[in-house]
């Protein structure tokens, strides 16, 4: 069962102290069991347990476990239920939760829903101190926590939390789940001083002395990863298990700052007697698998019309980019390069960003009410861009110009529709994947409301298996990441894969697959031969039986 955690948590908060009436159906079944610690199996007295009807979001109930961790919900109609639990030191979580998926509880005749052992996973935490080369605390440093998961089907390291160090240089991340984490710190030396173009000229006697002093203070901290790496490839992973307490102290090392001058060729505008600049070039760097992060320690200013200067940047490899002024087509640009010492770049010598526009045609069903968005996701950086669909069926990404790269394209807020065809001018299409090199791109998208559904049962030795990872694998998986579907088999072994575009697929069920690169064709190959092939046409509903591997 796929989790709808945001909705579930909001509902739980709204329903505190309340029990919504049961849906109108024959009642008489129970969900009962014991809440325990996942490692020690110690009963958790006072744990909070909630259920939500999968097909009726208005129905929910909440109880508190007794002195021996027992809980019970009675007089329930047959159906599927989401089971959630929390306690002191245990964040809210689903039953056998894996990322956004968990085991749903099936209730009905001949189904055992009364002997549940709900193993809550204790919170973990990471704390530490950020210091400089002399062991002094670095105050007000920005500390970022990254987690590596396989939620996208391949290793993906993304920021999950951030914190600011206190006056002792300390930070804390609490209420963490098990997993692999990395800590990074961005800061500016408190004593750093950077050249100011507005300062008055100095005398011949003062200039050499001040120049020497400024050289000593013209420094920056690189983005630093635990324990003291200046590149994410050298970061040490913190592998947390339930209830772990990890310490990650980080030492920052000051280095001579880069001086970057960017000439955009843009002329300033004047309005009401004031000079108006159209924003600053952005300075970013890639970390881990390609995630883009802004350089928060940099300090930029406009030296003159069309010229920008940056200080406070440590030597390294960066991306400098700027959107087109005033939304002019083909005006945006980017450049990835190594920076050290004093560097000047000219916008006219840099590759252009792409200006993406297009149309969307909806087939097979009326257009849903409300706003609809077209989403572009960069395969390398995971950067997501959104453009709103107009009432006339057009969209425009020109205000957030697109970097060259490979993109997946999907719809958001268009329930019941999936993109089936993509036509592009100025870009290359490979099935459901878009390869953009720059310049002007026009897209023609067709989305269909004729979507199917695949229901099934995961089996092991001809018996239903709960908690298996179910993966719907499309043909040519590399070019069709948006067609993958996943679920976790429920307590009766059943699963449901919704909003499936017609086509040929293979359904596989994996007993211990949650840490696999499930979208990698090489990883999938050994499992596909024992999967269940399906050929979905139109809005058909199929029922399949899948052997757990």
Which residues does each predicted region cover?
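Long luminal/extracellular ectodomains of secretory-pathway precursor proteins
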Residues: 2-549
